[in-house]
A protein has these predicted regions:
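PRY/SPRY (B30.2) beta-sandwich protein-interaction domains
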Residues: 1-208
């Protein structure tokens, strides 16, 4: 729909393929510049397919954050490999376009994988019950108070106890095919999702 009545007729689009995007509030997507070579993006970069070949491969979001409180979701649509969700520092994100660069075992990160393991600055420990095929993983990151909570289908992991992580600088959201020879598929929701959900939120301008 055009403000100047120069409307276009949609073809081969579902209802979830049509959303409102405005100059006052652009939504993040997967970043074609911060991805491994075997990451394939589609649906306006809201979907990522990562072919593992037994190695760790990653892709980040387009918009970085350095303060504030943020929430986003990812639908994980493959349960044949190990996957990781979290945040990595900008310095690490710029290296993700390498052929094989992990985001889970690095020095400035925080994340959660399908086995219920949390990662903080490269160190891992048990956290939550993990996730599987078609689960929706939510990430609530509070960079002001240095806390992160991960959700699986709306349920906070580790009884809602936040992961403590000191944030210093700028961070990107990241998903990673952590191990296995299959393909991991991710669908992102930064407010403009490629998948339908039963509930939703909007910003102060009514978008989202």
């Amino acid at each position: 729909t055009s403000g100047n009545t120069n409307h276009l007729t949609p073809s081969n689009l579902t209802a979830t393929d049509v959303t409102t995007d405005t100059p006052t509030n652009n939504f993040a997507t997967f970043n074609s510049l911060h991805k491994a070579s075997n990451v394939t993006l589609s649906e306006a970069n809201c979907k990522a397919a990562i072919a593992g070949a037994g190695q760790s491969r990653s892709v980040t979001a387009t918009i970085a954050v350095s303060k504030g409180k943020w929430y986003w979701e990812t639908k994980y649509t493959t349960d044949v490999v190990s996957a990781f969700f979290g945040l990595v520092s900008a310095d690490i994100a710029w290296n993700i376009n390498a052929t094989d660069y992990p985001s889970s075992g690095v020095s400035d990160n925080v994340g959660f994988n399908d086995g219920g393991t949390k990662y903080v600055n490269g160190s891992s420990s048990s956290y939550g019950s993990g996730f599987g095929n078609n689960d929706i993983i939510g990430v609530a990151a509070n960079l002001d108070d240095d806390e992160v909570v991960f959700y699986v289908n709306g349920t906070a992991q580790n009884s809602g106890t936040a992961i403590s992580k000191t944030f210093s600088g700028t961070y990107f959201f990241v998903v990673q095919h952590q191990s296995g020879s299959g393909t991991s598929n991710f669908e992102i929701n930064f407010g403009n999702p490629s998948f339908a959900i039963s509930s939703g939120n909007a910003d102060a301008n009514g978008y989202g």
